[in-house]
Curated annotation (Swiss-Prot):
Belongs to the eukaryotic ribosomal protein eL20 family. The keyword Ribonucleoprotein applies. InterPro entries: Ribosomal_eL20, Ribosomal_eL20_dom. It comes from Pyrococcus furiosus (strain ATCC 43587 / DSM 3638 / JCM 8422 / Vc1). Part of the 50S ribosomal subunit. Binds 23S rRNA. It comes from the Archaea. GO terms for molecular function: large ribosomal subunit rRNA binding; structural constituent of ribosome. GO terms for biological process: translation. This is Large ribosomal subunit protein eL20. The keyword rRNA-binding applies.
Amino acid sequence: MKVKVFRVHGYFEKNGRKFKFTKEYRGIKEEDVKELVYSDIGSKHKVKRNKIFIKEIKEIRPEEAEDIVVRRLSLEL
């Protein structure tokens, strides 16, 4: 099993407004990353899972990661 880097695009609804997000995570498969998105967005913004909408999950190369923590963790290996 190899850890990959994924970029996630989506939005969530809170108080009748929509907020876009783009996040980068490390994971083995897309399902793991989807679970991380629900957990992260839900806990930070107090939003239920049914109010979080994921438009796209795309695997990217570690060098393309904009999040410095994700990039450094991926390139150290």
